[in-house]
Amino acid sequence: RDAGKDVVLSTQTLIESSADVSTLHKVTANGEFTVEANDMGAVHCLEGKVPFVAGPHCNLYNLPALQWLAPLGVQRWVIPLEMGAADLAILQAGRPPGVQTEVFAYGRMPLAFSARCFTARYNNLPKDDCQFLCIAHPDGLLLRTRENEGFLVLNGIQTQSAKVYNLLPDVAQLRSLGVDVLRISPQSRHTGEIVALFRGVVDGTLSASDANAQLQPLMPAAGCNGYWHGKPGMETWKADAQGGLQPVLETA
């Protein structure tokens, strides 16, 4: 915060014990930092008390849900990972005044959460005595298909996409839709450089095509943007000269 950053504390997406409930209450009652609520229990703790962010795991897919949250104090919402540009345009047209929109723009997508830790299980250890072995797998454990293609990444309690969601080429469309904030999920290396590339495109000092070319060697796997274009999530699409879409072959 001293460096001019807006610090946001996130609540857990999966509450499964009294200790988790205690942590939830501590985070939502911190009294200093903005809180991102990632389930409706957190929303209940925050409603009417302080402005908050509705995280992507609140699963806000329609205008009635977004409008219901507005008087409770939501100041920003993060769209679900599967939401595409066409659906977002509908919600943006009826977005409550004063509510910002944030889009997950880069990173492996968190697709599901489990009460069990996959990394601990992989090492034949219980979750409560995991010895923090996830440190040995900073970008998670890659799961491949029988055809030896990257399919998912297991990272602690998260199941993530093997490919990296990348909306850097789509920044102009994000801006035209009135998106206020882009979310970049950190990786074990090169995150600072990736943020700088996005910053350059947003500020207009870099073209999207040049920045995307510089981004490729910094990514831990091939990219994808299918969800954004209303296609299967693992696919990559780009605009053609006629304003349509054409598929791009991405290899892991």
Identify what each model region corresponds to:
Residues 1-60, 64, 78-252:
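Active-site pocket-lining/capping segments in soluble small-molecule metabolic enzymes
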Residues 73-74:
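A cross-taxonomic marker for long C-terminal extensions/tails that follow the last structured domain
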